[in-house]
């Protein structure tokens, strides 16, 4: 289409580093540059705007579930990086108190490893301001952004949608985390039993669903 694609070589070469470079270019060349963010993070109006566009996912999912089953699900799971995917499907069920909304973050090497991207499932994130918005970020005691890790590149990010921060504080959304090893095992399970090859990001949701189902069955 004629656009110039610039790869980012700084830092860990993750979404955080790409956003940093994008914002540097934007503020340097405002006369001929427009900043567009595809995830539900960043300064207003991006979180609200992206969430609204993504809401079609939840609207269609809710309609199709009712047509197929005649009832609403007990739980809705979605992987959470920046949060646009999860905001999309959750919005179809926000007004249904009987439906539990569960976000699945990247647990990486596990709790306590500091090699993960779990902002709300673990206790390592703190409220901060970065990249033009306020939310929970993975950061050190000096407020500098921490390095992150995940087997899934799409979930490897320091912050989370500020709307999710609010919903989590209000108890409207629950967050869990899946480790890299759990994701790899779940990926093989889904391929073997369902004949599907899900993305590593999506597989975080399968891990959480399977673990919670197993826990509920035991109870």
Indicate residue ranges for each PLM-predicted region:
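A glycine-rich, Thr/Ser-enriched phosphate-binding loop motif common to dinucleotide/cofactor-binding enzymes
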Residues: 46-60, 199-204
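Phosphate/pyrophosphate-binding loops at sites that engage ATP/ADP/AMP, CoA/4′-phosphopantetheine
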Residues: 63-70
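C-terminal structured "cap/appendage" subdomains that terminate the fold
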Residues: 191-212
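A short, small-residue-rich loop immediately preceding and capping a beta-strand
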Residues: 72-85, 101-104, 215
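Active-site/ligand-binding loops adjacent to catalytic centers
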Residues: 19-49, 69, 98, 103-196
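Short glycine/serine/threonine-rich phosphate/pyrophosphate-binding segments
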Residues: 80-90, 111, 202-209
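Conserved small/polar residues in nucleotide/adenosyl-binding loops
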Residues: 213-219
């Amino acid at each position: 289409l004629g656009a110039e694609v610039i790869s980012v070589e700084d830092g860990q070469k993750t979404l955080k580093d790409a956003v940093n470079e994008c914002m540097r270019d934007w503020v340097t060349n405002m006369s001929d540059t427009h900043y567009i963010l595809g995830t539900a993070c960043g300064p207003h109006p991006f979180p609200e705007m992206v969430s609204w566009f993504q809401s079609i996912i939840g609207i269609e999912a809710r309609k199709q579930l009712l047509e197929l089953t005649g009832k609403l699900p007990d739980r809705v799971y979605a992987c959470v990086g920046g949060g646009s995917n999860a905001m999309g499907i959750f919005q179809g069920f926000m007004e249904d108190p009987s439906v539990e909304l569960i976000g699945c973050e990247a647990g990486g090497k596990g709790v306590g490893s500091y090699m993960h991207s779990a902002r709300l499932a673990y206790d390592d994130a703190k409220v901060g301001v970065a990249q033009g918005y306020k939310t929970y970020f993975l950061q050190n005691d000096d407020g500098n952004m921490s390095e992150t890790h995940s087997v899934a590149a799409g979930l490897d990010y320091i912050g989370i949608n500020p709307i999710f921060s609010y919903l989590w504080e209000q108890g409207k959304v629950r967050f869990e985390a899946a480790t890299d090893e759990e994701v790899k095992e779940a990926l093989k399970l889904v391929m073997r039993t369902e004949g599907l090859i899900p993305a590593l990001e999506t597989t975080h949701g399968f891990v959480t669903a399977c673990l919670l189902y197993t826990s509920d069955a035991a109870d």
